[in-house]
From Swiss-Prot:
Protein name listed in UniProt: Uncharacterized protein C16C4.20c
GO biological process, one term: transcription initiation-coupled chromatin remodeling
Gene Ontology CC, one term: Ino80 complex
Keywords, alphabetical: Cytoplasm, Nucleus
Pfam family, any one: INO80F
Presence of the UniProt keyword Cell cycle in the record: no
Endpoints of the signal sequence: none
Keyword Cytoplasm: yes
Compartments where located: Cytoplasm; Nucleus
Species per Swiss-Prot/TrEMBL record: Schizosaccharomyces pombe (strain 972 / ATCC 24843) (Fission yeast)
Amino acid sequence: MDPQVVNLLQETEEDVYRRKTARIRRKVSEIEKECEMYAVKIYNVERDIQRYRHEAQLLSKVLEKKGLNKEKEAGET
């Protein structure tokens, strides 16, 4: 008989449990790392969105002021 087959036949329930839990722990660890990576990406995107909104507000205010100044200049002449 093949040595691997003999080894599997001699494997106890405890060995099977240990092997399966080790595999599950590895998978959980991989998924946790992926979650951390996505959390960082989401944080960076949210920060970028806030920055772009702030820049858009500032630009809007600047354009409003320039628009009002042009209207005042046109009214004075």
